[in-house]
Amino acid sequence: MQPSARRPFDLATPAPNGLRRGRTTGTCATAAVKAALLRLVRGETVDAVEVSLPDPDYCLEVPIARIEPLASGAVRADVLKYAGDDPDNTDGATIFAEVSVNHAGEVRFMAAPGVGTVTQPGLRVPPGEPAINPVPRQMMRMAVDEVLAGGANPGFDLAIGCVDGERIARRTFNPMLGIVGGISILGTSGIVEPMSLAAWMASIEVYVRVALGDAPEAIAFTPGKIGRAYAAHPLALSKKQVVQIANFIGASLDYAQTALEEDRHRLGTLWVLGHPGKLAKVLDGVWDTHSSKSGMAMGSVAAVAAELGVAAALVEQIKTANTVENVIQILQHQPGAQAFWTEIEQRIAARMQPRVPRADRVAVRLFAMDGTPLGAAGQEAGA
């Protein structure tokens, strides 16, 4: 059942850093949903399915470990999580889906044992919902459509679980985020890119040198995908000039400085573009922003708010916020929100600048999870 016009994504081809890619929990859950649906709707038992990835050009074949009809009339399918060379706590875990007809004409998502439930604001899923992020939900809806192939949709309940997920979740950031009962079903591309090993740091150095190779006026660093669109427009940077640095902010700044020194060049502007959840940690002197090595920067963010005269009640909310995304929500309707985030940007840049003296300017731009500019970027984008 290969989705039309999609090419198979080959996990055997290593990432640019030479490491093996893997399948996200979102892809595993989608594969389990599709296999269970094929048994439930068509009576087919399969040993693998093809999952449509968010990139419309690709699909991914995923092995199915088990398919089992349940006494309730639902069908359960299991998939083994494969993380490649990424140090993922869920590697090897059994992700499963229990799929049943609900006769409500809609797809409903539920947390089976081992998948958590969101209890606090500030995440991409509202409180009370299973911890299944938006992109995996969309992938599962697409799998439903593919199995039905244009036929009537009676509605399905998709209960997603993880064997031993509650124990696995204790080794993740979920307890601090207020996600209770298990792991989260995550992923934005469907593919695990191995980003957290020392080997990935070595590859970042290569990418930094390539970005600086033609002595450009500017390059950009992004911890993740947030900020890439801004790098393309309005900054007009080429893909080669944009380096994804993962959690390794300090090392990446040092790589840039070393390359500029060796080439005896100067850089006009080093842009650092991303979500404040990672970048604000620099205010605390944190240069490796992985959650296992650092907490959230609520204290520093709240201190800036207090200095700028933000109401004391709001400052207290910031101090106790669940995530920095929650802080964005707290401040989004306040008249001084853009000025506040611009100040945060400037302070982060001031901490970074001494590590790259051969850059004339380090400029930080912050964005919400949906890509909305928070500070000065909003002024520039609207100019």
From Swiss-Prot:
Keywords for this protein: Cobalamin biosynthesis, Methyltransferase, Plasmid, S-adenosyl-L-methionine, Transferase
Reactions this protein catalyses: Co-precorrin-5B + S-adenosyl-L-methionine = Co-precorrin-6A + S-adenosyl-L-homocysteine
Signal sequence extent: none
GO function term, MF aspect, one: cobalt-precorrin-5B C1-methyltransferase activity
Biological process terms in GO annotation: anaerobic cobalamin biosynthetic process; methylation
Pathway: Cofactor biosynthesis; adenosylcobalamin biosynthesis; cob(II)yrinate a,c-diamide from sirohydrochlorin (anaerobic route): step 6/10
UniProt region (Disordered), positions on chain: 1-24
Disulphide-bonded residues: none
Leading EC class: transferase
NCBIfam families xref list: cbiD
Family statement: Belongs to the CbiD family.
The protein's name: Cobalt-precorrin-5B C(1)-methyltransferase
The organism of origin for this protein: Ralstonia nicotianae (strain ATCC BAA-1114 / GMI1000) (Ralstonia solanacearum)
